[in-house]
Regions:
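Membrane-embedded alpha-helical segments of integral membrane proteins
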Residues: 113-153
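Beta-loop motif signature
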Residues: 36, 190, 196-225, 229-230, ...
């Protein structure tokens, strides 16, 4: 449960709505009160109303996930925990809650093994929040600028050499941080993942209701969206299985 006011990350309201800028914080506090009073379904609806107004933040997704879990909507909990994790991938409480919610679903899907190097890459990407990563990148950008200034203003060869070496190191670190930041932004804005929201879904071998059945999924399973034909979405599971289901049975993370 996150009780602090909403740190809004995305606001998709027109400028003319500026006079109502405080209302999301008030709604957030009200939703928190409902949650603390044990009115979980009402709290879930209150958090959802804030999202419907165009506001997003990791705390909002996290609290909505908690309210969904407490009100018995496990798929909704997983969906919102996953959305929060994109913005706060290193949060231990969030990771724990998502694991608990995933233990409540019917399907157990074991992911295919991957190279250990990708685990290290994920750890590096998720070490800092987006804002923290951006701040550190700006810091090294400033250090590069300082090193360049020192190089051109220095009166001795030794000082110029130090500035050149330091600036080169700072520049390499800056480009590395920029690469990590771009990757994190890509993770946060991707639209190719979804959660099954329908209780039971029969996945087909082709985008046709008369096609043969491939397998069955239950609510709460996370899938990757790889293609779309009309109302049908082609999905891939973590274990590599592929099939087609109606797009209305899933919700994009």
């Amino acid at each position: 449960m996150r009780l602090r006011t909403i740190p809004v990350l995305l606001l998709v309201l027109a400028a003319s709505n500026g006079l109502r800028a405080q209302s999301p914080d008030e709604q957030f506090r009200r939703a928190n009160q409902l949650y603390q009073q044990g009115k979980f379904a009402e709290a879930r609806d209150a958090y959802g109303a804030i999202l419907a107004g165009g506001y997003e933040s990791p705390d909002l997704f996290y609290n909505l996930g908690n309210a969904c879990y407490k009100s018995g909507s496990i798929p909704g909990a997983i969906l919102n925990y996953e959305r929060a994790r994109r913005l706060l991938p290193g949060d231990d409480d969030l990771r724990h809650n998502l694991q608990v919610a995933n233990m409540m679903i019917t399907d157990r899907i074991e992911p295919t093994p991957r190279l250990f190097v990708w685990d290290y890459w994920d750890a590096i990407k998720n070490f800092l929040s987006l804002s923290g990563l951006t701040l550190v990148a700006y810091l090294f950008y400033a250090l590069v600028a300082v090193a360049i200034a020192v190089f051109f203003l220095a009166r001795t060869y030794a000082l110029r050499k130090v500035a050149l070496l330091a600036g080169s190191g700072f520049l390499l670190i800056f480009f590395f941080l920029l690469t990590v930041l771009i990757a994190r932004l890509g993770d946060a804005t991707r639209t190719d993942e979804a959660v099954v929201m329908s209780p039971i879904v029969t996945v087909k071998n082709s985008p046709d209701p008369k096609s043969s059945d491939a397998f069955v999924l239950h609510a709460g399973v996370k899938v990757q969206l790889v293609d779309r034909v009309g109302i049908w979405s082609k999905v891939r599971l973590a274990d590599g299985k592929v099939g087609w289901l109606e797009g209305s049975s899933v919700e994009v993370i």
